Amino acid sequence: MRAKIYHFLVNRKPGIRQRYHRFHDGTTGMKKVVSWFYLLWLNFCYYVLFCRFLGEQTEFPVYEEKKPPCAESESVLANRDRRSVSETVSFLMQYEVISFDIFDTLIFRPFSEPTDLFFFLGEKLEILDFKRLRMQAEAEARTQKYKEEKHYEIKLSDIWSRLQNEIGVIKEQGMQMEQALEMEFCYANPFMQQVFTQLREHGKRIVITSDMYLSKAFLSELLQKNGYEGYEELYVSCEYEKSKADGSLYEVVKRAYPDTDSMIHVGDNPVSDVKNAKKHGFEVFYYPNVNRNALLYRSYDMSAVVGGAYRGIVNNKLYNGTEQLPMEYEYGYIYGGLFVLGYCNFIHTYAREHGIDKLLFLSRDGDILRQAYAVLFPEEKTEYVYWSRAAATKLMAR
């Protein structure tokens, strides 16, 4: 019910949504209450006083203009000068111990921002503005940890100890739901999965090093689910109260291997995974974050949930380094699929509402639509019909 009210008052008009979040986000106490009255006032002005300008976003146009590369595909431009899987394996083979980062290196989330997962958790909990509350609780937990122990490394339980007082959800229940979503959404990076597997087949010594509030036990299960097994140790910042962010976790890894200085770390963060690793005696292999070009090429004039998933899925595909795809394929993957999915869903809904028991897809443009429709709704009757465009033009002209 709360989600429906939120959608009704906030999401129907882009301008109202923008103005409300600009005022509401980051507020606490009485100002948060005032923001709710502000939301009601915006709706009153728009629908009762006919202040239609409030429905339009300010500063940013409703539809963005992006200029993706036209001469070559994005994946070709991004991956042409990068090492292939086999070249990466050959390079890493010269080191005795190989350390891997987890998120955005071994494991992908289908989002352009990792915190987008909190949208889905908030929907399950039926809590408005949960993403902000979750991020705020994490920031406050880190601040409190530093005040008490002079470091920022926290566990998921520290975050939910704060959240349960804020939102009224039992800590253990919230933690379980959040971890279940991580397990559901996370998947293996196809590039690094091949690299990892080949290194294991060659008998290389592998460790995994991550700055994370999720427990070692949970991350072990997540890695196993996605095909990462056979590593020697998993170093997680919240377990050791040391981090890559300040370099102290690298010292923990080095102490575990006192007989070698032939160590390399693989990761996507220029500071934590590159600068700090070098500073603490590791060689480094920088794996560029797949979402680094999200602002340049991907659209942001979409809903937060759909837009985050769209950008993440597309960027994970194009920038992981596995393939150099032709422009035609990328055009379909980035743009065409969205339109086809939306149109097929529209046809399905229309047919169901009007009792239509068989759908005819007309040649030639209908061929791809019918193939997609058959995948989405295999139980429905469809037929591909040869049809003259000239006949269609004459029919519509009458």
What name fits each language-model region?
Residues 381-398:
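Long, charge-dense
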Residues 149-208:
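Short, acidic loop-to-helix structural element flanking the phosphoryl-transfer center
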Residues 269-284:
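Acidic, divalent-metal-coordinating active-site segment for phosphoryl/phosphodiester hydrolysis
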Residues 200-207, 212-238, 376-378:
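Substrate-recognition/cap helix-loop segment adjacent to the acidic, metal-dependent catalytic center
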Residues 89-135:
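Active-site neighborhood of HAD-like aspartate-dependent phosphohydrolases
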Residues 1-100, 328-331, 335-355, 365-369:
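Non-catalytic pre-domain segments flanking phosphatase-related domains
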Residues 245-271:
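Conserved Lys-Pro-Asp/Glu-containing loop-to-beta segment of HAD-superfamily phosphomonoesterases
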Residues 99, 207, 211, 356-363:
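Short glycine-rich phosphate-binding loop at a beta-alpha junction
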